[in-house]
Amino acid sequence: SDVCSSDLVLRTLVHSNLATHKPVLFKVLNTGLQVLVQDQGRHHVASLGVGRAGALDQSSFVEANLIVGNPKHAAVLEILNGGLKLKVIQPSVIAVTGALSELWITYKETGKRQASLSQPIALDEGDEIYLTRPKEGLRNYLAVQGGIYAEQVLGSVSYDSLAELGTSPIQVGDQIYSAQLKTYPVELNHFAQTKPKVGDEIIIDVCLGPRTDWFSKDSLKLFFNQRWQISAESNRIGLRLSAEKPLVREIDEELPSEGCCTGAIQVPPNGQPVLFMNDHPITGGYPVIASVAAYHLDLIAQIPTGCLIKFRQISDFMDLK
């Protein structure tokens, strides 16, 4: 499908020279698959050809910040499938939310202990943090009191993996700096819920349209009745779905590029849908059969490869012609 291009392909580093006036919080010893700096994302910039990006699981992102007394949209680390290891450079208070991983702290004075998720944890210089691969879910969020510093691009520090815009992915040897944000009294409201695990069947609510009528009635039945597997090629741009029987279009016309939203389910010529995530292209040239209900977007962010998805209709199709 078409992608609206932009000249704003800028990259900033969390260990940039511009950050040297900020206190160093951590040194990165290991990153696992991917560690990104994310905040609430970029809003009101679609006209520039720039997507939202931002934390995929917004509720876990906000929860992590509130636990340590940060403003709810302060920058955090988004950790994909565990593996993060950090060395503490100066005393800090952290919280880790999201996927059900084991959080291990090796205290300089007292040795290795398992710590609780969704709770504030005080750390001293020389301590080490390690996050295991999740048993449930896919992404964790690590907030530190005072926030994480990175340079903003178009009002956000978030990394957009499609446009390569924003703070570059964290690498071994990087230093994480404090944003020195004002903090607030902590209110512990634990909103952690059970996360999907490999083998689970996940029900996702969708609204039909805008191009549902481009598909045959049999294909629409298949869309709801089949169980869709998540491909290992899925990423922050989109979940690639596959099933035994592909969806068949009833209208074979060329579709002009049109705007797409996070959660849009686009169907390319092979009939195997792609569910757009936060880093999706602003426009698409394939028909969108349905879109995920907003309240299930956080759930989508936590579904690991090996789960099955089944879609559930919550609204009727309305032809807006």
Predicted regions and their residues:
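Conserved "landmark" site that anchors the functional core of diverse proteins
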Residues: 1, 6-321
